[in-house]
Regions:
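Flexible, glycine-rich surface segments
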Residues: 41-134
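Extracytoplasmic substrate-binding proteins
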Residues: 1-67
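Structured C-terminal subdomain patch of bacterial secreted/periplasmic proteins
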Residues: 10-17, 24, 119-147
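Small-side-chain structural scaffolding
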Residues: 23, 32, 85-87, 91, ...
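General small-molecule cofactor/ligand-binding pocket signal
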Residues: 2, 90-92, 147
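Extracytoplasmic metal-acquisition and chelation regions
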Residues: 12-13, 20-24, 69-84, 146-147
Length: 147
């Protein structure tokens, strides 16, 4: 029995590096190392490109689940991912690496005008999103189709 601890990682590259663990399990160490090296190179190139951005768009993350909206705290890998892309993550001031459980009203108050909405769940279309929760229509990022 092995326990996968990738959820403990605090950086995007830390999460990607778990490919080496799985490569070792299947005797594919060299291939996994090569894949990770490529991911690392491309990630760092993308971060360098993002630093030239002229704007810092606001970013909303997640969606409702069991009447709660879960978002990552400010020191999580997801927040770092957005920060390195020059995004303005709306809960970046929240200390820690876990998640926050928020009400819809709290999220709407803070993120109604967010420029982008990422990771909204397993919806196949914007229509499917709004069919699941009509209140999603209140977010400007959805209205602008920046989801």
């Amino acid at each position: 029995v092995m326990i996968n601890g990738d959820w403990n990682e605090e950086t995007p590259l830390g999460k990607a590096e778990w490919i080496k663990f799985f490569g070792a399990l299947y005797g594919l160490d060299k291939k996994a190392d090569s894949i990770f090296t490529n991911i690392e190179k491309e990630y760092n190139k993308t971060v360098a490109l993002a630093k030239t951005a002229k704007t810092n768009p606001t970013v909303l993350v997640g969606s409702m689940f069991n009447n709660q909206w879960f978002v990552p705290k400010g020191n999580s890998w997801g927040c770092l991912f957005i920060k390195e892309a020059q995004g303005n993550y709306l809960w970046s001031d929240e200390k820690g690496t876990g998640g926050l459980s928020l009400s819809f009203e709290t999220v709407l108050e803070q993120a109604k005008t967010a420029d982008f909405w990422i990771g909204p769940g397993s919806f196949d279309s914007l229509k499917q999103m709004t069919d699941s929760n009509i209140h999603y229509n209140q977010f400007e990022s959805l209205q602008a189709k920046n989801v």
